């Protein structure tokens, strides 16, 4: 899970 990638 990536946030602001």
From Swiss-Prot:
The alphabetized UniProt keywords are: Amphibian defense peptide, Secreted
Q: Which GO terms describe its cellular component?
A: extracellular region
Q: In which tissues is it expressed?
A: Expressed by the skin dorsal glands.
The GO annotation for biological process reads: defense response
Q: Where in the cell is it found?
A: Secreted
Q: Does the keyword Secreted apply?
A: yes
Domain of life the protein comes from: Eukaryota
Q: List the disulfide bonds.
A: none
Describe the task this protein carries out: Shows neither neuropeptide activity nor antibiotic activity.
Protein name according to UniProt: Rubellidin-2.1
Q: Which organism is it from?
A: Litoria rubella (Desert tree frog)
């Amino acid at each position: 899970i990536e946030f602001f990638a």
